[in-house]
Amino acid sequence: MTIHDLAEYEILDEHRVEDVQSDGFILRHKKSGARIAILSNNDDNKVFYIGFRTPPEDETGVPHIIEHTTLCGSKKFPVKDPFIELAKGSLNTFLNAMTYPDKTVYPVASCNDQDFKNLMDVYLDAVFNPNITKYEEIFKQEGWHYELTGKDDELKINGVVYNEMKGVYSSPDEVLSSQIYRSLFPDNTYSKDSGGNPEYIPKLTYEAYLDFYHKYYHPSNSYIYLYGDMDVVERLEWLDKEYLSLYDYKKVNSEINKQPAFDEIKNVEAQYSITMDDSQENKTYLSYNRVVGDSLDEMLYQAFDVLDYALVSSPGAPVKQALIDAGIGDDVYGSYDAGILQPVFSFVAKNANASQADEFESIIENTLKEVVKTGINKEALLAGINSSEFKFREADFGQFPKGLLFGLNCLDSWLFDDMKPFIHLECLGTFAKLRKAVDTDYFEKLIQEYLLDNTHGSSVTVKPKRGLGNEREEALAKELSDYKASLSDEEIKKLIEDTEHLKKYQEEPSSDEDLRKLPMLTRADMKKNAMPFSNIEDELLDVKVVRHDIESNGIDYISFLFDAGDFAQSELGYLGFFTNALGLVSTEKYSYTDLANATNIYTGGISTGTASHPDIKDRNNFVFKFEVKLKVLEKNLDKALELMEQMLLTSDFTDTKRLGELVAQIKARLQANLSSSGHLVAAMRSMSSFSRYALYQDELKGVAFYRSICRIEKELSESPKSVSDKLAAIAKKLFARNRMLISFTGNNEAYGNAKPSLEKVIAGFNKMSAVGNQAEVHFNTAKEAFIDASQIQYVAKTGDFICEGYEYTGALRLLRIILSYDYLWINVRVKGGAYGCMNTFLRSGESYFVSYRDPNLSDTLDVYDRIPEYIKSFSPDERDMTKYIIGTFSALDTPMNPEAKGSRSLSAYLEGITYEQIQKERNEILNAQPEDIRRLADLVEAVLKKDSICVIGNENMIKESAGLFENVEKLI
């Protein structure tokens, strides 16, 4: 039987989607009206999703709350948290759900056929038959609820989505984004935040929430996607029989209307919170925003990505440089959102002065007029096109399956035209047209039409306000106090009973009967053997080469690593700045603008970074490298190496104006990252009180690096030459053959072809640079808190089990899954209301527990301290134990692209990890019994006894717990 024989479906279109090596089908389910798009190919990492068009009508976050709650039990699978049960016990390569401004999507992926079928079944039952209509507690837990534990206690609001969005709205970047869409689309759905504004989330009633679900969650409003190597006919037959045939077509009014264009540009102002003692100077965000056509225009869809690069995102781009030269903003960047009906293009200046708003706008417009008049730099356009095309062809999305990203890309057009799911995947022809257009005035006309003459736009200014977060907290506290005062004794009693009832509901585990309804694999389904490493040593001109014989589709992945272990701790801040500046300053032959363009024209990117590797055999031997990575088509290797050589050996650090621009940009981006990635920052900072690895991470990327950048900024203004000299000295010290190691990922033929080019570039480096002993370090304080203007916390507690005499085993990988998806999930997220909580045990001994967007502080630390007690009483049955093992294997066996396989092999080489070790750990996981986990209780107790904590978050919460900390200071 073929897809053409399925009477239940109408084939609307079928054709070869050559650009993604797939056979494409567009179907309609006749009875229900469900839309189906299929990309059939030989990729065994199969992907499924079902999505719904879900336009919000207000700011209560109802689409977001439904996304959370549909995965809290269903008719066929009534367990309370099937999402977590699947995370524990499936071989998924992706498992999540996402709320967008206009749609909600539920994707899964797996390389295992039976697992893929299981995941599809659970997700489809979740969206069509969720338990949300039976249990209001689900809505309260994930959305919001009043919390009152005693009649004299303070009335509070809690809920996972509520706390998540409090964290989101603590970020000025997010405030700016929401205000941009509100300003541009006042009359359609894009003016409403689908995620929810914490001010309005508590206005959502259970009834309105259910109404939204019943309105939009129907097959007639659905978008179903299948990708990969599967029996498509079998899947479609099953889909019809089990779900779609149960529904008749229903007219669902979910269409998104276009926003009529404005007659004039809108001006909008908003505020974000900073702490009471923060300066308000140069903390304003300025934006220039325009609506650009519609998302069904294939040329515009790609062209404005190219214009983003050519006008503002690339080093020295004209709009960026004009604003920086005028002293407007520390960081200037572009933003292009093509995933909505009417795409939006923005220029943004971060850390500007509010008084510069008019000048900001006039500089942008004058620069654009000049660009239109004189023409855009053709090299910049070609660089932008090549960069986009290289990324598309490589299809490297890190840990995410490429089929998932292809599927999400489909929705950028499919949501607005049932016949056009694949138009943005068939883009190689578009890139060819854009290349031809470089020699015409096509791009200049786009600028004139959409950025200069277009009145459908806005200027949004977001200003800082001291203590705004505290004002909102106080206003909420008063509102809740007044509300409580208005209640009768009976109503207060009811609130207390509701709070107790919800806690009991949360504490009551799913029954064994319900748990057994969830489909599950067996231990026999697990791959017995670990993925091998590929490390083959070679030597070129006395430089060691580690090559990884891996098929890489004609792309060479090369890393040049330089020993940096003798850099003093006081030098690490400068090394961090050097890492960020290299490739963004001029060289002997290239201006920094031309260098960036040439890099993007001839390569898939040249990046710099640092890599820290503990030596598993010798704990005192810490491997610290400066790393330069490049990816390039074999035919362009010589050019790529020439560009890299220019960067490493001839970079000009005497242009202190340029250094000042880079310092300001790094500082601005760090300010955003320290808050948005607060969980990782807190974990590393906490471990930096005892771990060299974590200390280096903090010095090069975390709180210490931010402090160093602030000092370097001051030094540049007072003694610019000293900064230039230090950067030049780093280059001279680092880049020598005796410090060099080369990693090459590609097949044997590719390496053979590359050897002459590699030898040529090696010969250009000095032979020797004095290498000192491993530097001494001074660890940070063990108990710290950092205050920012957010309304939530990131709470970390860390330790080191190797120092306490324990060894790393595969059982620790298993314990991480058990804690993440059981104990921590239930106590920190479900009961505590935090958005997330995670833990890790590294081979080198460092371990952490950390929460994410957490309304609590000391309560979360108490949860961590009770972990050993939980482990001691751990007694799952065989089915549950197998589930944890399967979930652990899911993380172990994530599919990898060629670059990732090479990086994995290189890390093992540098850390002294053998295949025998990882196979032993794999066997320990596969054969683990409950007693193996219980034996880890003492190890975890030793980790927690280190009592190293770090909290980033709300000022009032930190001050209430001030006794926990030896050091409390502002984060930024």
Indicate where each model-derived feature is located.
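M16 family metallopeptidases and their MPP-like homologs
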Residues: 45-55, 81-129, 136-147, 174-199, ...
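His/Glu-based metal-binding/catalytic segments typifying zinc-dependent metallopeptidases
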Residues: 40-42, 49-51, 162, 166-171, ...
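Long, compositionally biased intrinsically disordered regions
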Residues: 432, 445-533, 671, 680, ...
